[in-house]
Amino acid sequence: MRTARHFLNTALFIFPLVLAAQDKLGTRDGEITFFSSTPMEDITAVNSKVASVFLPSTGAIEFSALIKAFEFRKAMMQEHFNEDYMESDKFPKAIFKGKVLPTSGDDLSRPGVHAVSVEGDLTMHGVTRHITVPATMTTAGDGGIQATCDLKVKPEDYGIKVPSVVREKIAETLDVKVRIAFTKL
């Protein structure tokens, strides 16, 4: 009797955890690209090591990007980006925590393309700002989801100072693209 009760208690504890684990999607190789265009110079950087977790049942979503993982065409650009602008030793990550908001009545578990809004807090360079951006989520038949989002980011909004010497080479607003392929964890 005691063994049966112990088994039942264990099963009741583990069953919700198994169900929750089945609902969790994630990746460790998402991609964030940013682009700066000025008459003086175009700058592109890519980070292909973005970690993200998405819970379709609640809409909760999180991203974490190591700043030093952004790669530039020129090594000198990468060095200045990490040391002078982003201070990546002091602020090693950019983090987003928020929620996916499907359009009214849309079911993200249904295969197809879904227009959504993503709302939450973006923390970068020690500054947190609340943002809301449109995004697209494409659900595959196997339950995987491709998520894409384009947004604009102003470095000054996050306390990132651009020295006057290079100000003409860096746009006031950066174009940021997020591309994530979520799979079941």
What is each model feature region?
Residues M1-K24:
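Bacterial Sec-dependent N-terminal signal peptides
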Residues Q22-L185:
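Low-complexity, acidic/polar, glycine-enriched regions of mature
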